[in-house]
Amino acid sequence: MMYLLIFLVSLLSCAGQLCQKHAAGASSGAGELRHRVRWLAISLLLLGGAMLVWLWVLQRVPVGIAYPMFSLNFVLVTLAARWLWREPVSLRHGCGLLLIVAGVMCMGVNL
């Protein structure tokens, strides 16, 4: 159950950050300002929801276990940006992502 909640925090946070990226990519103009504000508002809702779930998780899981698992957010954001915007992922970046996943697996086995 805790794994799922921590993963939910990562998903909400990832979605919020992707909404920020989408808002930042909007060009200037009156219609674009509404578009940007809408995506930023969605981002705030997602990140706020992530924070509330995260606080609930921290009440029940040692921070030494929970926080490293939250680093999966780096992996999710990178993969989503690659898929959505075709952002490049270098070999070194990919190796770093694999190390993050391996570290999370090593540290999260006690849950």
Swiss-Prot record:
Give every EamA domain span: 40-109
One MF term in the entry's GO annotations:
carbohydrate derivative transmembrane transporter activity
Which keywords does this chain's UniProt record carry? Cell inner membrane, Cell membrane, Lipid A biosynthesis, Lipid biosynthesis, Lipid metabolism, Lipopolysaccharide biosynthesis, Membrane, Transmembrane, Transmembrane helix, Transport
Q: Kindly give the membrane topology term recorded for this protein.
A: Multi-pass membrane protein
Where does the chain cross the membrane? 39-59, 61-81, 89-109
**Could you confirm whether the keyword Ribonucleoprotein appears in this record?**
no
Among Gene3D superfamilies, the record links this protein to: 1.10.3730.20
What pathway or pathways are given for this protein in its record? Bacterial outer membrane biogenesis; lipopolysaccharide biosynthesis
One GO cellular component term noted in the UniProt record for this chain = plasma membrane
A single GO BP: lipid A biosynthetic process
Q: How does it assemble?
A: Heterodimer of ArnE and ArnF.
| NCBIfam families associated with the record | PRK15051.1 (NF011625)
* Role, per record: Translocates 4-amino-4-deoxy-L-arabinose-phosphoundecaprenol (alpha-L-Ara4N-phosphoundecaprenol) from the cytoplasmic to the periplasmic side of the inner membrane.
Question: What protein does this entry describe?
Answer: Probable 4-amino-4-deoxy-L-arabinose-phosphoundecaprenol flippase subunit ArnE
* The organism of origin for this protein: Sodalis glossinidius (strain morsitans)
